[in-house]
From Swiss-Prot:
GO terms for molecular function: DNA binding; tyrosine-based site-specific recombinase activity. GO terms for biological process: cell division; chromosome segregation; DNA transposition. Belongs to the 'phage' integrase family. XerC subfamily. Residues 1-85 form the Core-binding (CB) domain. It is found in: Cytoplasm. The active site is at R146, K170, H237, R240, H263, Y272 (o-(3'-phospho-dna)-tyrosine intermediate). Residues 106-285 form the Tyr recombinase domain. It comes from Stutzerimonas stutzeri (strain A1501). Keywords: Cell cycle, Cell division, Chromosome partition, Cytoplasm, DNA integration, DNA recombination, DNA-binding. SUPFAM superfamilies: DNA breaking-rejoining enzymes, lambda integrase-like, N-terminal domain. One of its GO terms (cellular component) is cytoplasm. This is Tyrosine recombinase XerC. Site-specific tyrosine recombinase, which acts by catalyzing the cutting and rejoining of the recombining DNA molecules. The XerC-XerD complex is essential to convert dimers of the bacterial chromosome into monomers to permit their segregation at cell division. It also contributes to the segregational stability of plasmids.
Amino acid sequence: MQNELDAYFEYLRSARQLSGHSLDAYRRDLDKVLTYCERERIAGWRDLQGRHLRHLIAEQHRQGQSSRSLARLLSSVRGLYRYLNQEGLCEHDPATGLSAPKGERRLPRLLDTDRAMQLLDGGVEDDFIARRDQAMLELFYSSGLRLSELVGLNLDQLDLAAGLVRVLGKGNKVRELPVGSKAREALQAWLPLRTLAGPADGAVFIGQQGRRLGARAVQLRVRQAGVRELGQHLHPHMLRHSFASHLLESSQDLRSVQELLGHADIGTTQIYTHLDFQHLAKVYDHAHPRAKRKQDTDT
């Protein structure tokens, strides 16, 4: 079974060109299935049945795995069996008809508008690291980039004159995003300093040795900016969530927000309508004269 898994991972890496992060997620999920098969003495992928997966999902759920994680595990199994069927190694999919237990959907954490402005409007020193970090923060918030999209960004994807950035998102889909004036200013201040570092390639964001910044380095810089400016931990996806929520709050155009985020399914984007409702509810509670009725003291 391990041999088939290794061949599948190589297929994902070479033919599907999945990122290392996505490959790691597939590997974690399918390693759980393989461990279960070894424990239950299931000899091969042909022998794995729906009842086995139901047992594994129930077991993982009891151990505290979230519904989202279990849904991803089932998706990983379906992907594996599509490959096995294409290769003539199997003729069934044990995940057919199975779904993860429904759980309470967690709303993403984000910054409100005032906190976002506080983060971005702090003074910026005129040095390599400060200018680079400011440009990253502004671009995350201006254009709603994923971490992988920012890390992989090259100069030929930027058109600052037109105020556009072209990013390669999930599924190798290219989308064109606007770059706001503040982000353009931050990038224009950063790019001359980038050139002085002798960049090794066309990466927009590099370290002082000229090499492209990795995902962990970007996460660290964003976290440090959050602690310094806001006194809280901050991660890149919070800026993407903030971009989406603030844009939806102002425009009420869910379909456009979906396109900007690169979501294949509008259901994924609809989570931000719940966040917008939370904001409206807070405004209502604070401002409406009959939102909070005083307890009647008459007897």
